[in-house]
A protein has these predicted regions:
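Hydrophobic transmembrane alpha-helices of secondary-active transporters
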Residues: 39-84, 222-229, 238-264
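Membrane-interface helix termini and inter-helical loops of multi-pass transporters
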Residues: 76-84, 169-186, 230-236, 262
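Transmembrane helical segments that form the transport core of multi-pass membrane transport proteins
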Residues: 205-289
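Entry/N-cap segments of selected transmembrane alpha helices
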Residues: 11-13, 17, 74-105, 192, ...
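Membrane-interface helix-loop-helix junctions at boundaries between adjacent transmembrane segments
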Residues: 104-160
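Conserved small/polar residues in nucleotide/adenosyl-binding loops
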Residues: 325-326
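Structural signature of hydrophobic alpha-helical transmembrane segments
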Residues: 25-38, 60-62, 86-96, 119-122, ...
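Transmembrane alpha-helices that form the ion-translocation and gating core
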Residues: 90-127, 270-318
Length: 326
């Protein structure tokens, strides 16, 4: 416990900056506000002479908690989805592969990124997982920036851009946020503790095979198994999720310190181009499903769009689009 206390003592400045950044991000309706707000403000502060750091001793437990949180989006409907909608599932896989290959090729040829960096930077989703993976794989700040900044730009670009497309095609709708409503009884806390324990065991197993980002991957696999089969229903409350995202955003923002503003602008510019390419590919695949299989174009387009899962689901609810059927 003393080690964790000392780690918090070394990291508290970054965490406080992250909380402020997350709060400011909510005021301007930034997507993934507590993550991106904490990341961006820590990044800005890192350009100054004010020294901030985030201890890895805290970072690893945060990854495990976030893995359990992400696994909470799984449910038994995932099993039915592949069985009932095989064509859209295949199209989703192909769309992801095509988008990743095209954008990775762009990053390698135009931006001169390394191949493994280009692949991570090109993936059309899972910003949290990708950001934690690159932080765990390399200590090179420039390579981290080459992945995290284009990925953050993708989330911002796509999530801010998508609602305008829906307004022009369907009309204005109010998009309300929503969260998990839990009953905080003994069973709830036992299930949460159980998920953390089995995720810790899974982490130890993956670490033996030297798999990167073991805490978050183990938690998603192990906890995801129990969530998918609905053997457990307890999920972390929204406030706990926001705290975890502040910690993650602060950790990532600190680790990008040392990048020149010119490099950040360069990575952001190409992140916007990446987003446009991925949206174009998503539109093509959605159009194919509409023409040949009769799928609703806007629903299919939204499911293929390279935005965050939470934001896409919120938009689907606002526009009464059932993503489970595509």
């Amino acid at each position: 416990m003393k080690n964790y206390y000392l780690a918090m003592k070394r990291s508290y400045k970054s965490i406080l900056i992250g909380i402020l950044g997350g709060y400011l991000a909510t005021l301007i309706n930034l997507p993934l506000p507590w993550l991106l707000g904490a990341l961006l403000l820590n990044l800005v502060v890192s350009f100054t002479s004010y020294k901030i750091t985030f201890d890895k001793k805290i970072f690893l437990p945060v990854l495990l908690i976030i893995g359990v949180i992400l696994a909470g989006s799984f449910n038994i409907s995932l099993l039915y989805k592949i069985h009932l909608w095989i064509y859209s599932s295949i199209a989703m896989i192909i769309c992801t592969i095509v988008g990743t290959v095209v954008v990775a090729f762009y990053f390698v040829k135009i931006c001169k990124f390394k191949k493994y960096v280009s692949t991570l930077a090109a993936l059309p989703g899972a910003f949290v997982v990708i950001s934690t993976a690159i932080s765990d794989i390399t200590n090179n700040k420039k390579e981290r920036g080459q992945v995290v900044i284009p990925q953050a730009t993708r989330v911002l670009f796509v999530v801010l851009f998508l609602p305008f497309i829906f307004v022009t095609q369907i009309g204005y709708q109010e998009i309300d946020s929503f969260g998990n409503i839990a009953t905080y009884n003994l069973r709830y806390f036992l299930e949460i503790i159980f998920l953390i324990i089995v995720s810790l065991i899974g982490t130890k197993v993956l670490e033996k095979f030297r798999i990167p980002s073991a805490p978050i991957l183990a938690a998603m696999i192990v906890a995801g198994f129990f969530y998918t089969l609905e053997l457990t229903t307890a999920r972390f409350p929204d406030i706990f999720i926001n705290v975890a995202l502040v910690f993650l955003g602060s950790a990532i923002g600190c680790r990008l310190s040392g990048l020149a503003p010119k490099e950040i602008l360069f990575f952001s510019f190409h992140g916007a181009i990446m987003s446009a390419i991925l949206l174009g590919i998503a539109a093509i695949f959605a159009y194919i499903l509409k023409i040949y299989l009769g799928f609703d174009f806007m629903a299919a387009f939204l499911s293929f769009a390279p935005g965050g899962l939470h934001e896409v689901v919120v938009i689907s609810v606002a526009y009464d689009l059932s993503l489970i059927h595509i």
